[in-house]
């Protein structure tokens, strides 16, 4: 038994530093439902804080040493600085302190059936679709998702069953703190190389995660890197999905339409039904197959799986249509890696719009530098490309990489320092019938909102 599990058995009062973080809120809700007394603090007001307060949980704005008074355990976000006054006070007082990923791991062990969805791309969409299937099929799951599920309007769920559906992120090996009963492995691609350094190291982490899984490992049988990872995992029940012959769950007679995708579901060689997805693109065919295989493995009847999956129309910030105004469609997507951008932009280009505008915010210097050529290639797919400054986040620009260098290599692209400039340029030049899609895992969605405001003023 891990230290955090022992502590949770002994305590009742848990204090969250950074309780307003979107990744913290589902953990707070689940612990609260299990009878723990929760308190928390944050530096900024947010919708998430209001959601926490609605549960009757006291929240302090601002972080001070006295906020931890009475706490028997501290949970903090990975982004917290080591000199945070509450964290320092807790350590000085001998109060057990744990990072968010450790608490998420402990929560996965509170359930008999924890299904963890991992992979470089598609985690949020797949976890969201799977959660919707479980909810609408009457399974009453708990869930921790990396984005908002439109059905519930939240990124977490507290259910009464023993099912826990959890998005499992590989960054800094976060997922190795979890305890999966079932692993759903979507794909593996070069990412987070600032941490993993090499693709081999990244694959090795996924091998560890698959090996930790207690029951079934459901994986993409078409993905070469995934096959390498799975080769190192022994003594598991394996279930494959993909488009190629030989996969246990396969899509056949695929039709990719304007905003939809449909295909026949082939389960162990038998056609078990046709599904029409409310989300576009071949990449979402893979995501749907993964969710279908996981739901089927849990014993949900196929007719229910199909009906529930068809009712799913995407997760927040995953090709999310924000507004159709003056004949112009404004959308937003979380894509920030070349493979994700390629999937999203290729899908967008096939949807019949007059022109497709990609408004991209590069995220972190290391990724931009290491995958520079790939970014230049995929950002040449749309008709128009608009770039913002690189969002450095946790990094300093030791790579001497700048947006202007990307723009030089992408034909016809432009770049701007501010979202205001981006919005002004797009609104001035966009035409009826165009799709404008903001792309990135930072705050580029703010540029989309600015565009909408400016278009509304035009009338």
Question: What do these predicted regions represent?
Answer:
Residues 1-99, 103, 224, 250-252, ...:
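N-terminal leader/targeting and accessory segments in enzymes
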Residues 2, 6-15, 23, 27-34, ...:
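Nucleotide phosphate-binding/pyrophosphate-handling subdomain across enzymes
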Residues 5-7, 30-36, 53, 67, ...:
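Phosphate-binding loop of NTP-binding sites
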Residues 14-16, 74, 115, 141, ...:
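Conserved hydrophobic helix-helix packing surfaces used for dimerization/oligomerization
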Residues 36-43, 216-221, 357-361, 382-392:
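Short internal beta-strands
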Residues 41-42, 60-63, 98-105, 144-146, ...:
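Beta-strand->loop->alpha-helix junctions that form or flank phosphate-binding loops
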Residues 68-73, 162, 431-434:
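Short acidic/histidine-rich motifs immediately flanking catalytic phosphotransfer sites
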Residues 237, 376-432:
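C-terminal helical cap/extension that packs against the catalytic core
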